[in-house]
Amino acid sequence: MKMERKNVWHHRKKEEIEAFSKEYMEFMSKAKTERMTVKEIKRILDESGFVPLEDFAGDPMNMTVYAVNRGKAIAAFRVVDDLKRGLNLVVAHIDSPRLDFKPNPLIEDEQIALFKTHYYGGIKKYHWLSIPLEIHGVLFKNDGTEIEIHIGDKPEDPVFTIPDLLPHLDKEDAKISEKFKGENLMLIAGTIPLSGEEKEAVKTNVLKILNEMYGITEEDFVSGEIEVVPAFSPREVGMDRSLIGAYGQDDRICAYTALRALLSANPEKSIGVIFFDKEEIGSDGNTGAKARFYLKALRQILKMQGAKDSEFVLDEVLENTSVISGDVCAAVNPPYKDVHDLHNAPKLGYGVALVKYTGARGKYSTNDAHAEFVARVRKVLNEQGVIWQVATLGKVDQGGGGTIAKFFAERGSDVIDMGPALLGMHSPFEISSKADLFETYVAYRSLMEKL
């Protein structure tokens, strides 16, 4: 009669969990930005026999294809039947909160060269002070040449940091929003002046080093996207090594588990994954979930299958499609558990979390999954022996947030949010449970096969 929570560690083989976790940590060590994540996912797809959609020339009822959108988003499909029957999709985002270089970032102040940044997504600014940082990104020179920049991820590389104010001089009592200002999030770039240079000699020396390394000039930053991320490798956490600490688990943990599910599932209908950029800032732009790139890919497949009016048929496809919006949620953190309704809050190690709705206040700006669809999902999870739990985003009126679920619901699909719970979400070192990681993979695979 009563609904009881189950601890995953009591029901799964530890060896399975550990093997999956090791591969996940290897993935996370390479997937530090959305561009790097797309490259790694594309590499895995290529090795698994997937081909770019535009290069496919076989049976359109039996396709393993992918489409990349501007190097920042990617969709992959395993088509096994008439697409008009719809698909079972898992969608997620691969951008994470971070710092971005400003268009003209390099300055000198008090003989210290600094990189100016603008934070991206919802961060606590003080998290980013006095920790080692690395930079990754691309610059496009005036002639269109692409230059990749990676500094800080190799043992021999220098790292960067934003030094905090020492406590001895930090006696002023102020609100956090006033004390930690976004404009002050500047990385130390160097302190050695260039010999013979009178004005901004330290800045000029940094530019000289960058020019020697990459052949770039100061103006090239204008057409660049340089991202600042923590210089932390994924690590096992706890005496029992049951947890994983890493940057960017929101939401690359869902992307990885969905990708693995796509590759290992034995589906009865077509399945796919779509990984988006820009979720952390509202899913805007042509690489976010509001964009239409994946719809174009579906239209192309429909045309290959002989659809006469792919636009009309696409509506039918989307209405027949079931979508799992893969996103993380907030696990109960013992010192701060008063922000949760504990009866509806997820715990680490108790399986994948089923989130019927997100939003804020009176369920504003959310997809509230229909009861009929929740029942279908629950049935599959229970029949396949998946360990799951219920989750909401804190107490009513405590705060709120959103996912990409609503954008798929707006196009006619049934959607529900589902993913593992994290501690320290949006921090530079987020914590997940190895058990929940594995159970999320099992859940996504089961739903791809049976939903």
From Swiss-Prot:
<dbReference type="GO" id="GO:0005737">
    <property type="term" value="C:cytoplasm"/>
</dbReference>
<feature type="binding site">
    <location>
        <position position="426"/>
    </location>
    <ligand>
        <name>Zn(2+)</name>
    </ligand>
</feature>
<dbReference type="InterPro" id="IPR022983">
    <property type="entry name" value="M18_aminopeptidase_1"/>
</dbReference>
<keyword id="KW-0482">Metalloprotease</keyword>
<protein>
    <recommendedName>
        <fullName>Probable M18 family aminopeptidase 1</fullName>
        <ecNumber>3.4.11.-</ecNumber>
    </recommendedName>
</protein>
<comment type="similarity">
    <text>Belongs to the peptidase M18 family.</text>
</comment>
<keyword id="KW-0378">Hydrolase</keyword>
<dbReference type="GO" id="GO:0008270">
    <property type="term" value="F:zinc ion binding"/>
</dbReference>
<dbReference type="GO" id="GO:0004177">
    <property type="term" value="F:aminopeptidase activity"/>
</dbReference>
<dbReference type="GO" id="GO:0006508">
    <property type="term" value="P:proteolysis"/>
</dbReference>
<keyword id="KW-0479">Metal-binding</keyword>
<keyword id="KW-0031">Aminopeptidase</keyword>
<dbReference type="InterPro" id="IPR023358">
    <property type="entry name" value="Peptidase_M18_dom2"/>
</dbReference>
<keyword id="KW-0862">Zinc</keyword>
<dbReference type="InterPro" id="IPR001948">
    <property type="entry name" value="Peptidase_M18"/>
</dbReference>
<dbReference type="Pfam" id="PF02127">
    <property type="entry name" value="Peptidase_M18"/>
</dbReference>
<feature type="binding site">
    <location>
        <position position="168"/>
    </location>
    <ligand>
        <name>Zn(2+)</name>
    </ligand>
</feature>
<keyword id="KW-0645">Protease</keyword>
<feature type="binding site">
    <location>
        <position position="93"/>
    </location>
    <ligand>
        <name>Zn(2+)</name>
    </ligand>
</feature>
<dbReference type="GO" id="GO:0008237">
    <property type="term" value="F:metallopeptidase activity"/>
</dbReference>
